């Protein structure tokens, strides 16, 4: 699955237990203006990061805040299975949302990465 061009990061998300503190810090530090989106499960701050990937801050029961990159893949099931073959544990099986599918894996070294497959998109190798 090696390619001349790496898969692009499509979305960057901060997972935190303290949404108000994260909102204030990143707004002051980077000039981001998060937009609150109330979801059934939890509060979410959508971030406009300018050109490049989108972003968000999600409130969840984490011991420490962590940034989770969402990497664009052409086939979410294959990418998730390949990660498992390479020793990753699956934290979130491929799951459909309004705009696409996502999954989350933890690498053998403990790092986490999410895979993202949009519902409608230009093929990644067409760009």
Predicted regions and their residues:
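Conserved active-site tyrosine of GNAT-family acetyltransferases
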Residues: 22-26, 83, 110
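Conserved short beta-strand elements that form part of the metal-binding/catalytic scaffold
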Residues: 32-66, 105, 112-118
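Glycine-rich beta-strand-turn "strand-cap" elements at beta-sheet edges
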Residues: 95, 101-104, 111
């Amino acid at each position: 699955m090696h390619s001349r061009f790496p898969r692009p990061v499509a979305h960057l998300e901060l997972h935190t237990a303290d949404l108000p503190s994260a909102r204030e810090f990143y707004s002051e530090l980077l000039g981001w203006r998060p937009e609150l989106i109330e979801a059934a499960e939890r509060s979410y701050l959508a971030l406009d990061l300018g050109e490049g990937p989108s972003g968000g801050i999600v409130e969840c029961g984490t011991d420490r805040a962590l940034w989770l990159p969402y990497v664009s893949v052409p086939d979410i099931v294959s990418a998730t299975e390949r990660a498992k073959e390479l020793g990753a544990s699956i934290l979130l099986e491929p799951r459909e949302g309004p705009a696409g599918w996502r999954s989350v894996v933890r690498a053998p070294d403990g790092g986490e990465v999410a895979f993202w497959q949009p519902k409608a998109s230009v093929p990644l190798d067409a760009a």
